[in-house]
């Protein structure tokens, strides 16, 4: 048994001091002063304790692309960022489009992951958009179905996939992008792309597919979840669909809340991501969507790449940035410290609301819940240094940025998944 003493937890939006008693995989007691002679006591000295974060959008790259990232490193990077549950996307080799392929990934997760990982199954075989994946045999073992990394272009294929997913009580999770509108773009089609003379990706290529899919989801009776919304039009479509009673939810990534196209200083592949950084007007619409509840959850879209794939110009570099290790801290620094978001809202968007959106038994800090928790030093600040990342991916454009609110200890089902060696070097749980 373990007692965390002198920690602070959120209660009705306020930080209050509580002790937490953990026995095995579960939290058994939360109270003001817990004494138990059989328990190991850890003094948190006023640090903040939150439920372990849940990330429904990560790219762990294994099997197939281990030169970019692997499950061993990705799970430890996630734990360092405070995440105790993650959902790896299916753009792998082999693609998890049948149980035989999925089993390869599940076995590696069992062997190498320090946190809970629930993978996606693909919608189509090989994510090629031509033949359906084996939904029925995948369903008991996957979080949801997605062809993330590309949009499902055929409306009938998406509609029939939604119908099957609904019968299996699974969500369809979509990367929304109409290929006919991309036209080889590498950044947002806007002021900055014109200044840099680079091909742009129009906002409508995202929002038009969301508009199509919410109507298909309504007809199919399916839970439809939109990945990484990035435009004001996308927020508007989701907001109106929710008002119409359609079961649609969506996520936003930290980088789309923090930055816009004008933050891109030069033609540098580290700033290339999909969706791209949009306009300031889009960024403000995303923030408004978070505040009014249109946007349900925050997800990182952690997308590691090898150095040779990112140290290129925008037209040649791979899409994607890493985010697992810095997501909470960047958002805390940018939005909670200035008072734009409450600490309660930010934590809920990464825990409680994720669990509610997908009916998961995680994301709670209460008696009887899993001992998934993260201890955060809200006063500690560091500068982002990719050389210190636990992820194999170093591809972030935020090098040198000062961030506050640093996770220092992460437990998943009562086991240490990450600890700050400076603060907890002598703790062996």
Go through each PLM region and give its residues:
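Metal-associated gating/positioning segment near the N- to mid-region
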Residues: 45-112
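Active-site mouth loops of central-metabolism enzymes
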Residues: 56-69, 92, 118-130, 149, ...
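C-terminal cap of metal-dependent C-N hydrolases
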Residues: 7, 313-316, 370-429
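Alpha-helix-loop-beta-strand connector modules within alpha/beta enzyme cores
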Residues: 99-116, 164-174, 326, 330
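Histidine-rich, glycine-flanked metal-binding segment
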Residues: 1-51
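Histidine/acidic residue-rich metal-binding segments in metalloenzymes
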Residues: 132-298
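Divalent metal-coordination and catalytic microenvironments
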Residues: 7, 25, 46, 57, ...
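His/Asp/Glu-enriched, well-ordered alpha-helical/loop segment
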Residues: 195-223, 270, 291-292, 296-298, ...
